[in-house]
Amino acid sequence: MDFGHRLNFPTNHPLNLTDSDMIQKADLILSLDVRDLYGPLVKLDRITRKTVYITRKDCKIIDIGFADINISKWSQDFMQLQEIDLHIAADTLVAIPQLTVMCEEALNKNGKKREDIRSRFDEHKRTHEALRAGWQEEVKKNWKGEPISLPRLAHEIWQVIKNEDWVLSCNTLEDWTLGLWDFDKAYRHPGKSLGTSTQIGMSTGVALAHRGTGRLVVDIQPDGDLMFDPGTLWIGAHDQIPMLVVMYNNRAYYNDWEHQIRMAEQRGTDEKLAYLGMEINNPPPDFATIAKGMGCYGEGPITDGDKVGPALKRAIEYIKKEGKPAVVDTVTQFR
């Protein structure tokens, strides 16, 4: 299971069970370079901020990595400390091959155990395939929705870029890209995005790192994030940093809007007022025009999923010819 802080495991591998219930079922969890181990093991109530463990009471935890000796230049008094049964301070690049050899030696001494593992592999493969099939079904459910549904947008981007040597910079479109795309190389994704006003800058940095490699860097760009620093587009144009910017434009600071809805429910106040200070509408920013004003390619806004693919192809053609960012403003549903 990959928690997405960097790309650790191919998404299409039959043993990738991310988003399954394996944590709830496991009798042993091996953690590899997981800084916040507590988070994946609990369920969070977003109103009360209370957590409840989802793991079995008899589940053992082994942690391999350097998290315990991590030093921050400012502070390290954050995140919940997770109790573990065994911690091994080691570089996982060194430890995993050695652990693999040890497992092979143990299996060579016990043929029955190897058969059990093969049977378990087949079971996990079926679970993986069912997960992927379920996500594909979600794409079809709201295929014609306007604005564009997130699964549909992830699908449309994938159909255009899958034959390119691509890199996804930060935002994963609420993880729909991880469920629908084939992340098959470590450089495909440096890790999940951070908070608002960071993503356009991080994406530009990723694009700069890959400049000259022939790779197509894709930034799925939230509208609220770009509102904080649209001038970054000018940097991309000025310094000729090629990047495909596909807007995740739900015309809202919806993460906070959603939180205000939850708080209204808790406090018994009017949920209809949750939009105050949260909508990016009336009027909606014209991101295509903003992009053009910064010296980039701009197209949109697009609310029809059928028009996304052709627009992306035009943008990619511009990127390959001019070597500068291209912005396609796709308007999406909130979630």
What feature does the model see in each segment?
Residues 16, 82, 86-89, 114, ...:
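Hydrophobic alpha-helical scaffolding
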Residues 120-130, 330-335:
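A short, charged, Gly/Pro-tolerant segment at domain boundaries
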Residues 4, 33-35, 65-67, 87, ...:
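Anionic group-transfer/hydrolysis microenvironments
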Residues 2-124, 312:
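Glycine-rich, acidic loop regions that bind phosphate or pyrophosphate groups
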Residues 14, 20-25, 96, 176-334:
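Thiamine diphosphate
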Residues 28-30, 166-167, 216-218:
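Structural motif
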Residues 125-211:
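Active-site diphosphate/adenylate-binding microenvironment
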